[in-house]
From Swiss-Prot:
BP terms from Gene Ontology: hydrogen peroxide catabolic process
Tissue: Red blood cells (at protein level).
Protein name: Hemoglobin subunit beta-1
Residues involved in heme b binding: H51, H74
InterPro entries attached to this UniProt entry: Globin, Globin-like_sf, Globin/Proto, Hemoglobin_oxygen_transport
Family in the record: Belongs to the globin family.
Domain of life from the UniProt record: Eukaryota
Amino acid sequence: VHWTAEEKALVNVVWSKTDHQAVVANALGRLFVVYPWTKRYFAGDSAVQTHAGKVVSALTLAYNHIDDVKPHKHYEGFHVDPENFRLLANCLNVELGHTLHKEFTPELHAAWNKFSNVVVDALSKGYH
């Protein structure tokens, strides 16, 4: 994936202006409301908070290696449908829009969406 300097700067804006743990936890909550079948992977609220931390770690790793995001296999024992990564990315985009309000410009949204698609593709490739 080719990143322009502007796209990288826009992804950095999102990353630097948000409380990662809170945004991801809220996005997971939104995921469970909009796509209730995804909740089956979690035993309770503490599992959700723990998973939010894991998602933040994965996003941080991808952010730190934005030019070379590697495929990663999600926990085998959970048998997670890779499409759920895309659903979570969509919910994360909504949560970022809610959090950043007017700062979540179309350009910022496009750059973040490109980043989240790269991450989702890397996670999904871990299954093939």
